[in-house]
């Protein structure tokens, strides 16, 4: 394992950015991978029913996030603060399948999945996140 954090008040993107900054790397995240993006949750986000912390998190991290064509409601949800989020764990790509198998083996972990990959820091320097 290279790094791990609990996804709480800074949301997935805020915590991912902190991890990337600590290692001076870039991250590419699959915006559709997190399980929280159900149609009902997305509809609430489209209606603007979002916690105030989402706006603070977006302000903190948006300059380092390339959202590409990811819809605004999905972006907002990835910035949303969580009070009891999951874990974000970074491992070597070669170790990912074994970690997933171990986590899911006995049923105590209800969900685990690959949500992105680590790359070198951007040409402009510093950590960045690209959403795909």
Specify the residue positions occupied by each region the protein language model found.
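Glycine-/charge-enriched secondary-structure boundary and capping motifs
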Residues: 1-132
């Amino acid at each position: 394992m290279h790094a791990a954090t609990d996804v709480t008040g800074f949301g997935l993107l805020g915590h991912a950015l902190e991890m990337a900054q600590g290692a001076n790397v870039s991250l590419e995240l699959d915006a559709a991978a997190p399980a929280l993006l159900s149609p009902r949750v997305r509809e609430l986000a489209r209606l603007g029913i979002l916690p105030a912390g989402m706006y603070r998190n977006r302000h903190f991290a948006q300059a380092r996030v390339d959202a590409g064509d990811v819809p605004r409601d999905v972006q907002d949800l990835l910035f949303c603060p969580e009070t009891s989020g999951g874990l974000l764990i970074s491992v070597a790509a070669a170790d990912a399948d074994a970690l997933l198998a171990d986590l899911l083996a006995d049923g105590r972990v209800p969900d685990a999945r690959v949500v992105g990959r680590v790359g070198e820091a951007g040409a402009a320097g510093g950590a960045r996140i690209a959403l795909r």
